[in-house]
Amino acid sequence: MTYNPRIGGFTHVKQASFDVHVKRGEAQPRTSFAQQIKRIFSKIGETLGQLFRHRAPDSAPGRVRLQGVRYVGSYRPTGDAKQAIRHFVDEAVKQVAHTRTPEIRQDAEFGRQVYEATLCAIFSEAKDRFCMDPATRAGNVRPAFIEALGDAARATGLPGADKQGVFTPSGAGTNPLYTEIRLRADTLMGAELAARPEYRELQPYARQQAIDLVANALPAERSNTLVEFRQTVQTLEATYRRAAQDASRDEKGATNAADGA
């Protein structure tokens, strides 16, 4: 698979484009992890491109009428925007699972790449979520969290490198299946619903669905590693957030004491 910017994803290439190329009995060097991630997006993009090009006009969902509290098309009407949006997200998850689950199970190389990309996405999202939160500024908590997060990522066997003593995966970024789910959901629900704040509120749910999709498609060992890594990351976040809160209280207490002196 190769990345096609015109469709924002993948197009098919011959099997020889994967990491190991056989020529006269000799294995060639592995491609970079970043290139592997691009191939995953390329594979996904090809399917999305076909979806957008070949969808019949009468198969598209009807226009959403928010004022009439009725969502028409092939979906059950509802007056709750969040419920309707979640329905479209769930439908997108089903469609992506139908396409990708067999590929992950049958294509070992693609399955490995999706597995590693999902681990990297969990790492990257946790790092951004923690470090961009003003509540974690106090003390020296952020560097300590990143170091602990890197150690957890290293323990999964992800490829990466130490940068100033902190392990960083080579392919940190967005879960490619989450991207596919979101693009499909956008297409199903239409621009009016996709612009609503309820859709943004449901993105953590969509991300979790993407992780669950991958975990359910993987062999047991990798599935367990994926689930355990996510649980470890959640524990680390909770632990270091408490540390940041304690540090913030200590700083405020010291400031108040100095003012009263």
UniProtKB/Swiss-Prot annotation:
GO MF annotations, alphabetized: GTPase activator activity; guanyl-nucleotide exchange factor activity
Signal peptide start and end residues: none
Domain of life: Bacteria
Coiled coil: none
InterPro entries (alphabetical): SopE (IPR005414), SopE-like_GEF_dom_sf (IPR035949), SopE_GEF_dom (IPR016019)
SUPFAM superfamilies found in the cross-reference section: SopE-like GEF domain
Localization annotation: Secreted
Gene Ontology biological-process entries: actin cytoskeleton organization
Keyword match Secreted: yes
Keywords for the protein's UniProt record, in alphabetical order: GTPase activation, Guanine-nucleotide releasing factor, Secreted, Virulence
Gene Ontology cellular-component annotations: extracellular region
Keyword presence, Secreted: yes
Chief location of this protein within or outside the cell: secreted
Family: Belongs to the GEF (guanine exchange factor) SopE family.
Subunit structure: Monomer. Interacts with human CDC42.
Function: Activator for both CDC42 and RAC1 by directly interacting with these Rho GTPases and acting as a guanine nucleotide exchange factor (GEF). This activation results in actin cytoskeleton rearrangements and stimulates membrane ruffling, thus promoting bacterial entry into non-phagocytic cells.
Name of this protein: Guanine nucleotide exchange factor BopE
Organism expressing this protein natively: Burkholderia mallei (strain ATCC 23344)
